[in-house]
Design a protein with these regions (language model features):
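Short, Lys/Arg-enriched N-terminal segment that forms or immediately precedes the first helix
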Residues: 1-9
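Extended alpha-helical scaffolds
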Residues: 2-3, 42-44, 57, 164-171
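Short amphipathic alpha-helical interface segments
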Residues: 11-33, 86-176
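N-terminal interaction modules that seed assembly of large macromolecular complexes
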Residues: 28-81
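Short amphipathic alpha-helical interaction segments
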Residues: 37-52, 172-189
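A short, conserved structural fragment
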Residues: 51-62, 183, 187-198
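Minor-groove-contacting beta-hairpin "wing" of winged helix-turn-helix DNA-binding domains
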Residues: 62-68, 198-205
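Short, amphipathic alpha-helical interaction segments positioned at domain boundaries
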Residues: 69-103, 206-216
Length: 216
């Protein structure tokens, strides 16, 4: 099966996903067969869009896949749109590939450095912002964070999260008397933990000179 990562407006359409899987399993497909397979879809219009985008090839009234399939990880960049076959040798390597992301903000000099997989399924703040922005499906854990934060402005959230985290410059434990969604979010993300006394402790590495927090 062909998997699409970081789909565009065209490639995230449900019909496109079904179409490429159909063409991947059938040879020398004609338009009539596609219309019969997808009777409730505006096939003519969408097929022209896919052909114009270079994703589908039409030759002698036959339709074929023309996807730029991933064959190597050498030039792979995070958030790049890719097409990859689950049966290919590069697929497993892709799942194991790791990337580093950095989050900065305009309020202070704090930096959040996080590790992620290519699909951004790992529970990090960067992944959350990315998926909400592009309306990608959330993992169960990311949905838990969404239930707290919702579609929050990233700069606004970072302002309050980093301001709280920087308090660990002077103290090892912090009290938060009132319920705070940003503090709750830091707990869900794994940046802080609440001890038996109800105080919060830092749960990640913190370079105090560089004001950098590392979420492994």
């Amino acid at each position: 099966m062909i998997q699409i990562f970081n789909p565009s407006r065209l490639t995230r359409q449900p019909f496109f996903g079904e179409l490429i899987r159909y063409l991947d399993q059938h040879d020398d497909v004609i338009l009539r067969e596609i219309k019969a397979q997808f009777p409730d879809v505006a096939v003519d219009k969408l097929m022209e869009e896919y052909i114009k985008a270079g994703l589908i090839l039409r030759e002698n009234k036959r339709y074929y896949l023309n996807l730029p399939m991933l064959e190597s990880l050498d030039s792979l960049e995070l958030d790049q749109e890719i097409f990859v076959s689950e049966a290919s040798s590069v697929y497993q390597a892709l799942l194991e590939q790791r990337f580093e992301t950095e989050l900065h903000n305009q309020t202070n000099a704090a930096i959040l450095i996080e590790q992620t997989d290519f699909a951004r399924t790992k529970m990090t703040l960067s992944n959350y912002f990315c998926k909400v922005k592009h309306q990608y499906p959330l993992t169960e854990k990311q949905q838990e964070l969404y239930d707290i934060l919702g579609d929050v402005n990233s700069e606004y959230a970072l302002k309050y999260m980093t301001t709280f985290l920087l308090k660990f410059l002077k103290k090892d434990q912090l009290m938060q008397k009132r319920r705070d969604i940003f503090v709750d979010s830091l707990v869900v993300l794994g940046y802080i933990v609440q001890n038996e006394d109800g105080k919060y402790e830092l749960a990640v590495d913190f370079d105090k000179e560089r004001l950098t927090f590392y979420l492994a």
